[in-house]
Amino acid sequence: TRAGRWRGHEKTECGIHLPASALAGDLRRTRVPLIKDGAYVEDAWLRIEGEAPLPSDGDVIVDWIRLKEEASLGHDRSGRLGVVFPNTEDANLLAPHLGRLALVALELPSFTDGRAFSQARVLRHQLGFSGELRATGNPKADQAAFLVRCGFDAFEVRGTQPLEVWQRMLASVSRVYQRGYSEGAGAVKS
């Protein structure tokens, strides 16, 4: 047996992984649980797949291809507009669209793929995006504090990590050497 490698079928003893049956009832209210401000919240946004028609009102999220191909998208309806932006694209491509976007969802396809962290920094620091910045795909609680430092303020949670783990991980970094998105100058914060 290698050290650090879980050998059992059920990973429930470590405190990070729980079976789906053990998840809190409020977690199951939305199709994809959403954590915002340290709590589960109901997702008010409707994700529109492909070329499906947009509803006349309500907040909608479209994919990047549709946003860039339809210049007037969202102008003839009430409700806010958001986009799912792939991590394979340069975040600067969103610059001409940011004035009409209230949400940008950045994809984290795997734990080892950090491109969305860089995109978030560009959106917040260089382009001045002030809307909701959502981590989608496969964000993990282990990344929570670092996602917030890059500017994320909402997380779609597809795994079985309970809210308590996310809250603990959000508070886990007590000293930092670089400024985060919403912090002032200073080399060390404690």
Task: Give the location of each predicted region.
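Glycine-rich beta-to-alpha transition loops that act as phosphate-gripper elements at the mouths
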Residues: 87, 130-141
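Catalytic cores of alpha/beta
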Residues: 92-96, 140-153
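Active-site-adjacent beta->alpha loops and helix N-cap segments on the catalytic face
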Residues: 67-71, 111-122, 164-172
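C-terminal helical cap(s) of enzyme catalytic domains, especially alpha/beta-barrels
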Residues: 164-189
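Glycine/Thr-rich beta-alpha phosphate-binding loop at enzyme active sites
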Residues: 80-123
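N-terminal, charge-rich interaction modules
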Residues: 15-19, 25-70
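Hydrophobic faces of well-ordered beta-strands that scaffold small-molecule active sites
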Residues: 60-62, 79-83, 102-106, 131-135, ...
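Glycine-rich phosphate-binding active-site loops on the catalytic face of alpha/beta enzymes
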Residues: 152-170
